[in-house]
């Protein structure tokens, strides 16, 4: 039986995209374990998806100084607490220990940055559910003036800090911060015309539209042929 580890970010969006995929994989007899936020636990338990570890949490994360003028993903993720690298390194090391015990064949992440980092270090194939705004090849109009800073490598940038940690672990370096949210397969749950990306071939990126779960017994033959 193939095993999959799932981590998703906070808010309803990542969970609402991840849960249908987890349900379909469970139906296909994959063993799935997840890590998510407290608000998601009731829904995941109801769906029969087991936690990787009930004691693993990120409630002790300390947010950085708020900056309403942030203009890059690097700045935003630093601001919400991931710029604190001693904390990030500790949590990733904890996660790696748990993953060694579970031994997943794949990691599935919807903006679960700790899982993305662990995948890069452990060499476990990553299926990344991403938003176009966190894809390295997107260029949003209101970020255009500061877009070059996405590659900013000062010692204060999260890109620099992550690369220092990845180098220490013998893992591949990042070219941009948002590259951490791409995988062996990168899925955009949207439409190209609505969220265009400059080069979809890079990072093996695929637009799939809204992610929904249809029980196998009620799915049409046309839908089943997709799989």
Where would I find each of the regions flagged by the language model?
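Alpha-helix C-terminal capping segments
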Residues: 117-125
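Nucleotide-sugar donor-binding and catalytic loop/hinge architecture
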Residues: 1-2, 202, 214-227
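Short, well-ordered beta-to-alpha junction loops that form the rim of enzyme active sites
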Residues: 110-113, 191-192
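Active-site regions of enzymes building and remodeling cell-envelope glycoconjugates
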Residues: 47-57, 124-126, 201-212
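Active-site-proximal region of nucleotide-activated glycan assembly enzymes
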Residues: 125-204
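Solvent-exposed alpha-helices and their adjacent loops that cap or buttress functional pockets
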Residues: 100, 178-181, 227
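Short beta-strand->alpha-helix junction loop in the catalytic core
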Residues: 191, 208-217
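Glycosyltransferase specificity loop/lid
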Residues: 1-108, 116-118, 133-136
């Amino acid at each position: 039986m193939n095993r999959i580890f799932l981590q998703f970010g906070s808010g309803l969006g990542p969970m609402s995209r991840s849960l249908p995929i987890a349900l379909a994989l469970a139906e296909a007899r994959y063993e799935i374990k997840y890590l998510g936020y407290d608000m998601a636990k009731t829904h995941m338990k109801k769906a029969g998806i087991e936690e990787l570890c009930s004691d693993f949490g990120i409630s002790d994360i300390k947010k950085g100084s708020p900056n309403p003028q942030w203009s890059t993903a690097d700045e935003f993720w630093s601001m919400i607490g991931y710029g604190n690298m001693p904390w990030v390194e500790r949590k990733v090391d904890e996660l790696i220990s748990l993953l060694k015990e579970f031994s997943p064949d794949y990691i599935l992440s919807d903006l679960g940055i700790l899982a993305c980092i662990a995948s890069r270090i452990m060499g476990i194939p990553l299926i990344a559910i991403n938003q176009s705004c966190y894809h390295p090849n997107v260029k949003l109009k209101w970020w255009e003036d500061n877009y070059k800073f996405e590659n900013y490598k000062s010692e204060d940038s999260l890109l620099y800090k992550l690369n220092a940690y990845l180098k220490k672990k013998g893992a591949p370096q990042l070219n941009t911060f948002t590259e951490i949210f791409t995988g062996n397969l990168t899925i955009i749950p949207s439409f190209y015309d609505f969220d265009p990306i400059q080069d979809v071939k890079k990072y093996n990126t695929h637009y799939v539209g809204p992610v929904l779960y249809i029980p196998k017994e009620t799915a049409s033959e046309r839908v089943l042929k997709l799989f």
